[in-house]
A protein has these predicted regions:
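Substrate-binding/charge-relay-adjacent region of secreted/lumenal peptidase catalytic domains
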Residues: 47-145, 154, 159-447, 494-571, ...
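An often Trp-containing, charged/polar helix-loop segment at the C-terminal end
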Residues: 588-666
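Compositionally biased, intrinsically disordered low-complexity segments enriched
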Residues: 34-50
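Polar, glycine-rich mid-to-C-terminal structural blocks
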Residues: 441-502
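Secretory targeting and sorting signals
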Residues: 1-36
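Walker A/P-loop NTP-binding active-site region of P-loop NTPases
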Residues: 583
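Acidic, glycine-rich loop-and-strand cores that form catalytic or ligand-binding grooves
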Residues: 487-516, 605-632
């Protein structure tokens, strides 16, 4: 159960799904051996009660022979696992989620209530009883049961009991965190008479730290102070004393855009929409102790309206776990929450915002937070700025069920595409291969990529390029840049928006005719898929930290002892997804009804004035660059300033490149918002 990373990652693996118009998993779960009633011991195929069926993706990809650290089997210890329930009609749920979200379909906009979703597609008491009986019969103890969307039977017991229950042996392997981890040596299985009730199983490996009972949350961390000089709008200040690049003096980076500036650039202000009547849910881990006061102070400082009484609410886990710096790092998530809330409120100042704080940053806890929203229909828009490389966990089918149930209810999920490009190991040391991020790669969520945005003096849109930059430091003599611009890659790589082609999902119907086949069949490992696959992102918005947004938060001051409200400039697709989610709230207000899962509607507007078509080279052969200064110690505003040239529009190199070209591309999707809100008026 890996930890999810803020701002760009959260992954899970593949499991069973029926072939759908929207998308399918390419690594489907083993078909149940029985077509009889789960738990009755009856088999529609005539198999005996000892027959078993495999449960896909329960053998971690990293548990290979070459990664084995001991030849001895693991026979002692404790296993805490969740057996997720498949519900009554997984294929029917996926089909309805597609139909209700697709303009022109007879079911478009005919959303179900939470009760209707549960009655049609949720787990049954027969399934709960059958699964519980199987597990307790093997010697495991049931510790919790959830019988809603994302339902499960949680169990605990000895390794020997788990081995009996799931038909595996356990070994010791070098895990993704480079330590010795326990993992099953085979794919787990279930008795044939129960298998149709099982969606997936998690918790059989120990790829992360164990949960602690209830951590006390630490105080906020230090601020990241923006060094001078910087500009309030693009091109305000030119770096006249620094070396030229590409035949010209380059502008200083901006100090951090305000929501007012971004609303102007993306034509939010011109629409007159404010998100009134719409509720946006934001999911992160933990909860900042100063969130509401910080958001209201930030609104005042930037010239916007604070939250009205009751406009911002929180739904928090009863206890928090894994908060330490070497686990989830709770103070870092405070900053994530602050950015997310302030950005959504900045784009949709009249929308209601509900913050759902997960118990930790594990896939399991964040998934529980998402399920809470669907089970209680807390919002019609859900914005999430986290993820991880797609190969790291076994909970992908659980998330897919949650997203599909949400779509059936008219809930749209938005995820950041990532801050490490194509997750090439040279771009992201935490990824062991080039790949996309999950949940952003899911065909049932809107993946939001990143751009570098230039906003003019009058809050006007100047230009945009895909977010991806290479740094070139100032030479020691201050007369030139250390290397010939743009500098060295990957040594100078400074982050970029995520995207690429999924290994896990086939091309959804809404991408057909928009995403070029040559792109959709080009797998990350260089091979060619026989059929088109899901490509992300779907849309994009400002994410470059050097053209980022101002954020205000109570932080530890440079003296190391006091806390005070401070401003900083923040970027990443954590920004872009919240910007777009806020704009989606405005679009929903304009439409007068929930838009639900937005991708079919978004792709319907491809090539229109709803979107800016973002490319790497908006001015042809002219290269784009900025000059940026950083404090040597930005937490304390100390040390000499370090100056860099940042060349823009370089989202990876070689096989890791995500070029932004005319039309759809896997760096910026169909583009960034232009007259998107107005297209619904």
């Amino acid at each position: 159960m890996p930890y999810v990373t803020r701002g760009w990652r959260a992954g899970l693996t593949a499991a069973a799904a029926a072939t759908l118009a929207v998308g399918v998993l390419t690594a489907a779960a083993a078909a149940p051996a029985s077509t009889g009633q789960p738990g009755t011991g009856q088999s529609g195929t005539g198999r005996s009660s000892t027959a078993r069926a495999g449960i896909a993706d329960t053998h971690p990809a990293w548990a290979t022979a070459s990664a084995r650290t001991s030849s001895q089997p693991v026979t002692s210890g404790t296993v805490s696992a969740r057996v997720y329930l498949a519900g009554q009609d997984p294929a029917g749920l996926a089909s309805y989620a597609t139909a209700v979200s697709t303009p022109g379909n007879a079911l478009y906009g005919h959303y179900l209530t939470t009760g209707q979703v549960m009655a049609r597609y949720g787990p049954t008491q027969v399934q709960v009883s059958a699964v519980s009986s199987w597990l307790t019969g093997a010697g495991l103890s049931v510790t919790a049961v959830k019988d809603e969307i994302g339902g499960y039977v949680a169990v605990q017991g000895s390794v020997r009991a788990a081995a009996r229950a799931f038909g595996v042996t356990f070994g010791t392997f070098r895990g993704p965190d480079r330590r010795a981890d326990r993992a099953p040596e085979q794919t787990a299985s279930a008795p044939a008479g129960v298998a149709s009730a099982v969606l997936t199983v998690t918790g059989l490996d120990t790829a992360t730290h164990d949960m602690t009972p209830a951590d006390t949350l630490p105080p906020p961390g230090p601020n990241y102070w923006v060094a001078p000089p910087c500009s309030t709008y693009y091109g305000q200040k030119i770096a006249v004393r620094e070396p030229s690049a590409y035949g010209a003096k380059q502008p200083w980076t901006n100090c951090g855009y305000t929501p007012h500036q971004i609303r102007g650039a993306y034509h939010v202000a011109q629409s007159g929409m404010t998100g009134k009547g719409v509720t946006v849910a934001i999911v992160d881990a933990y909860a900042s102790p100063t969130m509401l006061s910080d958001a209201n102070q930030y609104a005042k400082v930037t010239g916007d309206q604070p939250f009205a009484a009751g406009q911002y609410t929180q739904d928090l886990a009863s206890t928090f776990t894994d908060a330490a710096a070497d686990e989830c790092d709770a103070p870092g998530w405070y900053g994530e929450q602050t950015l997310d809330v302030e950005a959504v409120h900045g784009m949709a100042p009249d929308a209601n915002v509900v913050y759902v704080g997960a118990a930790s940053c594990t896939d399991q806890d964040l998934g529980d937070a998402l399920a809470l929203i669907v089970d209680n229909h807390l919002a019609s828009i859900v914005s999430d700025s986290w993820g991880e490389p797609a190969d790291l966990t076994s909970e992908l089918p659980v998330y897919e069920e949650i997203f599909q149930a949400g779509a059936a209810e008219g809930i749209g999920f938005f995820f950041s595409s990532g801050d490490s490009g194509y997750e090439n190991p040279s771009e992201d040391p935490g990824s062991d291969m080039q790949q996309t991020d999950f949940p952003a790669e899911s065909p049932y969520v809107t993946s939001v990529g990143g751009t570098s945005l230039a906003i003019g003096r009058s809050n006007n849109y100047e230009f945009e390029t895909s977010w991806g930059s290479v740094l070139d430091p100032l030479a020691a003599n201050h007369r030139s840049w250390r290397s010939t611009p743009p500098g060295q890659w990957p040594a100078g790589y400074d982050g970029s928006g995520g995207g690429g082609v999924s290994y896990d999902f086939a091309q959804p119907s809404y991408q057909q005719g928009v995403v070029p086949n040559r792109l959709a069949t080009a797998l990350p490992n260089g091979s060619t898929s026989p059929t088109p696959m899901r490509v992300e992102p779907d849309v994009s918005a400002v994410a470059d930290p050097s053209t980022g947004i101002l954020v205000g938060q109570t932080t530890l001051q440079p003296n190391g002892t006091t806390y005070a409200f401070s401003l900083s400039r923040i970027g990443g697709t954590s920004v872009s997804v919240q910007i777009f989610a806020g704009i989606e709230a405005d679009a929903q207000q304009a439409a007068g009804h929930p838009l639900g899962f937005a991708n079919p509607v978004i792709y319907e507007r491809y090539g229109t004035s709803a979107f800016h078509d973002v490319t790497n080279h908006p001015f042809g052969s002219r290269k784009l660059a900025e000059v940026r200064s950083n404090y040597t110690n930005p937490d304390t505003k100390t040390g000499p300033l370090v100056t860099y040239l940042r060349t823009l529009g370089i989202d990876g190199e070689g096989t890791a490149a995500l070029p932004a070209v005319k039309g759809y591309d896997d760096a910026t999707g169909v583009g960034s918002p232009a007259w998107y809100i107005q297209s619904f008026q």
